[in-house]
Structure formats: C-alpha cells, structure tokens
Amino acid sequence: MTNGDIVTANSCQFSDLYFAIRGGGGGTYGVVTSMTVKVYPNKPVVAQSLAITPLAKDTDSLLDAITDIYQQYPNIMDSGFSGYGSWSINSPMPNQTASYMHVVAAMNKSLVQSQKVFDELFQTLQKYNGSSLRILVVWYEFPTYGAYFQAMSGVSQPVGVASPNSAMTSRMFGKAALTTSRTALRNMIGTTAGNSGEPTFNTVELVGGGKVLTDASDKYSSVNPAWRSTYIVSIVARSWSNHSSAETVKDDITNIKGVAMRALDPLLGSYMNEA
C-alpha cells in the first residue's frame, strides 16, 4: 500500500486492489511481492505459421487477403486459437518487404482438427496463391506448452518500429466489426496500411474471443470492460526521422489512422498501454 503496508488482495479482501492488479497490470497498479496462481495439467499444442508476400509488388491483393484473414479471426479464435501477427506494405523495419505473417496456437487439439478450423480461410486465399501472392503455411505439433514456448514463443522477434521516434494507436475490435461489412473493414485496413512514403507497421494481437469471452462473467477479469467483447487488438505505428515531421506523423496516427479504426468499432476502446 502507499503507507508501506503489505496486504493480501483477492476477491474477498482488498478486492478493489485485486481488480486493478489482475485486470489492469501488476506493474501499473501495484507492487506484487508474491502471488498464488492456479495451475493446469500440461497439454499438447498445435501451432501454425502463415506468411504472405506479394508477387510483382501487388499490395492491393495483399490488403485484400489481409481483409479476408481479419474476417476469419473470430472463427479462428472461437475455435481455441490465439497468437500474434504483423503486416506492412511500407515497413519501417530494416530489410523487410511488404508482407503479412502470424503465428497462432491452440492447446489439446489434433492436427486434423486444427486444419479444419482454417479450411474456409484457405479456400478463400487460394485465389491469390501463385497469381498475385505467395502464401506459405507451416504446421507444428508440440507435446507440451513448454516445448511450444521454447520453439516459437520464447524467441526474440522484432517489435514495433525501428526508430525510437514513433507514434502508435490501437483499437479493440469485436466480432461484428470484423464480420459485418467487408467493404468497411477493407477501407480501414487500406487507411492503416499508409500511403506511399509512409513507413507504417501494423500488429495484430489475437488475445480475445473464445474462452476469454466465456469468462466475461468474472467481474475481476479486466479493468477495461471492452475486453469482454474484444476479439483482437490492432495496433498501427509510424516513425519519423527528424523533428520537423513528428507532428505530421502524430496527426496522421491520431486523426487519420486512429479515426478510421474507431469508426469501424466505435463501441469499444484502446488498449491502455498502446493508445
């Protein structure tokens, strides 16, 4: 506590502190000296990596395919998958080209069950493969979560923008925003992709949906109630190389890209650390 006392916080005592720490972040709302967590038996993990790159610089087809993927996120996540993705048509990262990639995983599913979850998406993407896009899908099976983490999740990966001078915004998206209007979704993706000469990086956090929403009745699960109907958090970031362009980039992130994201799902919000 602020007076130096150490207390035990749970749903029965100091529940307001428990709510803030559990639902908002331990490092943000309190100093946690020890904790008790519930453990579960180890389960096998099936993971998938998907990488898409355009042929002949066909970024329109890449953005169309990204739209198709976004529309399938709720189905994928309700089937037990979670993970992270990123994409860009003007990447600020060194030696990176226009591309989309993700790694997703699910526990206690067979490879056959997992592949069926993606049947509809890959049937949709088939029309691009080899004609306008190069699509690479790889499946992995691991005996335990620890083996999966060591191989695919616990490795260093490039994060965010290369420059220390950058601005970002984020938006939580629910199922309706992702599935109701393909035109509206494609317009938002086209806006957050950025124009020529705008090095822009998009990150997708597939951390909602499925069991997260099933547990929404737990009032201590999140400070931000928008999480209780969120499927993905989409983050867009841009960098600038000199001070003179900083305000231009900040205005674009806030009033162009951020507004486009908010318009697609005005009822939810932003992730507090990445607003």
Predicted regions and their residues:
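Soluble FAD-dependent oxygen oxidases
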Residues: 1-275
